[in-house]
Amino acid sequence: MAPKKKVSALIKLQIQAGKANPAPPLGPALGSHGVNIMDFCKAYNAQTQDKMGQVIPVEITVYEDRSFTFVLKTPPAAALLKKAAGIEKGTENPLTHKVGSVTKAQVREIAETKMEDLSARDIEAGMKIIEGTARSMGITVTD
C-alpha cells in the first residue's frame, strides 16, 4: 500500500457548472496553494458538463506535493428553492414580505436531491431543513 499523502489545504468553493476558469475568484484561491489551475478547470468542467447553469459547490483537497483531488457537492438548497419557486432572489425581510411559494412535493424532491449533504437521518428531517431555508428566504411552503 502506498504511503498517504500529507494534506496541505482544504478549499471550498462554489463555481458555475462547466464555467471554471483561471480568473478570480478561482485563480487566486488555487494559485496561493500551488495547484495547477488549468488542470483543475479542465477536470471540473468535464465533470459538471451535464449540470450547466447550476452552481456546484466543490471541496478541493490540496496535498503537499501540489497534487489535488476534489469532491463535487449538490447545489445549494437556496438555489434549488429559487428555481422551484421561479424567483430571482429571496426577500430582505422574510417575516413580512413573501416572494414565492413551493409545494411539499417540491420540498421533498429538493430534500431527496440534497440528502447526501444534509445532516439528517431521514427524508422527513431533510424536508424540515429545506423548509427552514425556504422560510428564511421569504418562500412559503404550501400543501
Curated annotation (Swiss-Prot):
InterPro entries per UniProt: Ribosomal_uL11, Ribosomal_uL11_bac-typ, Ribosomal_uL11_C, Ribosomal_uL11_C_sf, Ribosomal_uL11_CS, Ribosomal_uL11_N, Ribosomal_uL11_N_sf
Keyword Glycoprotein: no
Species of the source: Bifidobacterium longum subsp. infantis (strain ATCC 15697 / DSM 20088 / JCM 1222 / NCTC 11817 / S12)
SUBUNIT field: Part of the ribosomal stalk of the 50S ribosomal subunit. Interacts with L10 and the large rRNA to form the base of the stalk. L10 forms an elongated spine to which L12 dimers bind in a sequential fashion forming a multimeric L10(L12)X complex.
Family designation: Belongs to the universal ribosomal protein uL11 family.
Protein name per UniProt: Large ribosomal subunit protein uL11
Domain of life of the organism encoding this protein: Bacteria
Lineage: Bacteria, Bacillati, Actinomycetota, Actinomycetes, Bifidobacteriales
Annotated signal peptide: none
Record function comment: Forms part of the ribosomal stalk which helps the ribosome interact with GTP-bound translation factors.
Gene: rplK
Keywords from the named record: Methylation, Ribonucleoprotein, Ribosomal protein, RNA-binding, rRNA-binding
Any GO BP annotation: translation
Post-translational modification: One or more lysine residues are methylated.
Stretches of the chain forming a coiled coil according to its record: none
Gene Ontology, cellular component aspect: cytosolic large ribosomal subunit
GO molecular function, one term: structural constituent of ribosome
